[in-house]
From Swiss-Prot:
PANTHER family: G PROTEIN ALPHA S SUBUNIT, GTP-BINDING PROTEIN ALPHA SUBUNIT. The lineage of its organism: Eukaryota, Metazoa, Ecdysozoa, Arthropoda, Hexapoda. Residues 1-31 are annotated as: Disordered. Residues 42-382 form the G-alpha domain. One of its GO terms (cellular component) is plasma membrane. Residues 352-357 are annotated as: G5 motif. The keyword Metal-binding applies. Keywords: GTP-binding, Lipoprotein, Magnesium, Metal-binding, Nucleotide-binding, Palmitate, Transducer. This is Guanine nucleotide-binding protein G(s) subunit alpha. It comes from Drosophila pseudoobscura pseudoobscura. One of its GO terms (biological process) is neuromuscular junction development. A lipid is attached at residue 3 (S-palmitoyl cysteine). Belongs to the G-alpha family. G(s) subfamily. Guanine nucleotide-binding proteins (G proteins) are involved as modulators or transducers in various transmembrane signaling systems. The G(s) protein is involved in hormonal regulation of adenylate cyclase: it activates the cyclase.
Length: 382
């Protein structure tokens, strides 16, 4: 009689080992799926919404500075081209508007006319390479009173918010060894197209922030982000009260923002998602109100009868008219949320300046408890 096991016994052992191996793999997959599910449920997903140029992407940059590792030297260097383009777009737009405004604006110094011709004829080229004379012409034009007067009328045409900031810094940016600082990165304007996700952690709590384009043709992409959102952060540019849309020169920007907020607030798919309202660009709003050239009442007649509310917080050095203006804009949004609120979602307003890191740090810290409560309610833990 042989001393080896039968072939049937061997096959049975192999099958048994395969079954054990398959079960181990299956158990490992199940454990991983359970971990992923727990991580997903523990993550706060924040959707940034708002009209174009409201400051959404700047908020995302602040989250990177505050809660990730900021921007590497390589990333900063990569931003130089965008910053130079901001300078070019700014001086091109301002000098181009001088003749199209009604009434038009003349240069203070006639000898600057060739500089304007250079900017309009050469700097507009798609493959423009920013030679030294470009910076020289730009610096001299930025000193011209006619150019400055045209800048002050920028609500009459389309100009990027960061125009003055970068035109003031041309002498630094033209340096071959220039590296952007954090404020340069925050101020740099690049059109957002598509959906961008930023992940960060605060006190061991995971956040995913989704930034989507705000122009009208970008908004159809928003619906892709609505699934399982913890909260919406709606960003509005308060300083846009005297401006019109790039994509529709007949529509006031702040009214567009109010209409957009109303459509989101009343959307049947979002009835259980609360909105954190960032009343942004408070610095620019204050500048405009103090200058007195574009009165809020000229664009919103309701402001004439508006009284500063009793809950307004005012410091000793605050301008009463600026306070009245910012609370008026706040209350225009709250009027929408209270008119159709059903108790299932709420609006939490905050005054923000997206380029001010300390301001955004404080505001986001104030919002974290609200977001946590929304998250617990989302998974019926509250």
């Amino acid at each position: 009689m042989g001393c080896f096991g039968s072939p049937t016994s061997k096959q049975s052992d192999v099958n048994s080992e395969d079954s054990k191996s398959q079960k181990r793999r299956s158990d490992a997959i199940s454990r991983q799926l359970q971990k992923d599910k727990q991580l997903y449920r523990a993550t706060h997903r924040l959707l940034l919404l708002g009209a174009g140029e409201s400051g959404k992407s700047t908020i995302v940059k602040q989250m990177r500075i505050l809660h990730v590792d900021g921007f590497s030297e390589t990333e900063k260097k990569q931003k130089i081209d965008d910053i130079k383009k901001n300078i070019r777009d700014a001086i091109l737009t301002i000098t181009g508007a001088m003749s199209t405004l009604n009434p038009p604006v003349a240069l203070e110094k006639k000898e600057n006319e060739p500089r304007v011709e250079y900017i309009q004829d050469y700097a507009s080229s798609p493959d423009f390479n920013y030679p030294p004379e470009f910076y020289e012409h730009t610096e001299e034009l930025w000193k011209d009173k006619g150019v400055l007067q045209t800048y002050e009328r920028s609500n009459e045409y389309q100009l990027i918010d960061c125009a003055k900031y970068f035109l003031d810094r041309v002498s630094t940016i033209k340096n071959p060894n220039y590296t952007p600082n954090e404020q340069d990165i925050l101020r740099c304007r690049v059109l957002t197209s598509g959906i961008f996700e930023t992940r960060f952690q605060v006190d061991k709590v995971n956040f995913h922030m989704f930034d989507v384009g705000g122009q009208r043709d970008e908004r159809r992409k928003w619906i892709q982000c609505f699934n399982d959102v913890t909260a919406i952060i709606f960003v509005t540019a308060c300083s846009s009260y005297n401006m019109v849309l790039r994509e529709d020169p007949t529509q006031n920007r702040l009214r567009e923002s109010l209409d957009l907020f109303k459509s989101i607030w009343n959307n049947r798919w979002l009835r259980t998602i609360s909105i954190i309202l960032f009343l942004n660009k408070q610095d620019l709003l204050a500048e405009k109100i103090k200058a007195g050239k574009s009165k809020l009442s000229e664009y919103f007649s309701e402001f004439n009868k508006y009284q500063t509310p009793s809950d307004a917080i005012m410091e000793s050095n605050d301008d009463p008219e600026v306070i009245r203006a910012k609370y008026f804009i706040r209350d225009e949004f709250l009027r929408i949320s209270t008119a159709s609120g059903d108790g299932k979602h709420y609006c939490y307003p905050h005054f923000t300046c997206a380029v001010d890191t300390e301001n955004i740090k404080r505001v986001f810290n104030d919002c974290r408890d609200i977001i946590q409560r929304m998250h617990l309610r989302q998974y019926e833990l509250l």
